């Protein structure tokens, strides 16, 4: 019993101490809050400072959140546009391959080609026969080529020697370097659409002249004998500016967005939307009908040429842009943090490499345009922030003036009180 009583007294004592501590803590908190409240009421200048600090924090947090959201949406938009462009391009390239295969497997075409190729160990003995076969091929291919916008053709045997062609100067040649890459793949049984390259024969330009080294490309399909062995190739000539580049031009958006294709050497194989600007920058020759296709390398000039910067080294010695260097390695990526393009302008972009066609495709837009809404928001905030700072300074100055007047009034009151006390003492 005695132990129980001592325990109860101890419990009551502990409870009393706890209550005492809580009361003390509450009183301390209350006094602190009271002093803080009095300070804030007395020192009015502190409110604008607090508002500035809070606004700065909110602005910083909001900008980060908005920038993150914008980058996410921009990344998604660039990737979607690139995917659509690549899908359209791959569909078009597949159609070209299907067209070439269809003609290479045509009975009439195969019969003419078999006569040109001859049986193993034999050659065409009479030029008249070869010329007649050439005319027959021209007649058989003409309707198909016209309906599908092909501008020429050639046929080779298995040794890659050209046996017939719409351009007679090609017949008999087996040393055209530009043709060797895709012909080698065709002899392995592939149907190949070549990237655009400079023509080795004359092509009619807009002025009506025939010019060499104009952009051209070929779709080439294997020709098989009755045992399904590859015995030759049929190549159909395409003008890339008619459909190939037009598909990519559909990927332009805004004032600076563009989609373009390029080869393994970093040369653009479609047109840039900035051809006129590139002439003024000296990146393209100032000539009639000057175009960027096959003339412009995607190299980083190390500075913004549109702002007056000029590199002090040859363009061939400049590195590829970040995008091009990544793509030619076979990589696909999106960059919304910014990198320099072939003009030296900071851009954001998405890119991919299409290995079966040996070309890369990129979609880019100027960084300034992509983040223009964020820049407008940021400028608006800084204007408001500056106005708030001016208000804070004005209130701070007003508070100092009020505080000085208050001190002077208090001093005058004290002096008056002292004078009154002295007067009463004399009385």
Residue ranges of each PLM-predicted region?
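Cytosolic signal-transmission helices at domain junctions
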Residues: 68-76, 401-423
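Conserved small/polar residues in nucleotide/adenosyl-binding loops
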Residues: 425-427
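Positive-inside N-terminal membrane-insertion signal
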Residues: 1-52, 411
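Conserved beta-strands of PAS-like sensory domains
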Residues: 165-167, 176, 211-248, 270, ...
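Membrane-interface helix-start motif
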Residues: 36-37, 67-70, 243-248, 365-385
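Juxtamembrane extracytoplasmic/periplasmic/luminal helical "stalk" adjacent to the first N-terminal
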Residues: 37-39, 44-128, 142-150, 214-219
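Extracytoplasmic/periplasmic ligand-binding sensor regions of membrane-associated signaling proteins
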Residues: 138-237
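Intrinsic low-complexity, intrinsically disordered coil/linker regions enriched in small/polar
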Residues: 165-166, 203-207, 226, 242-352
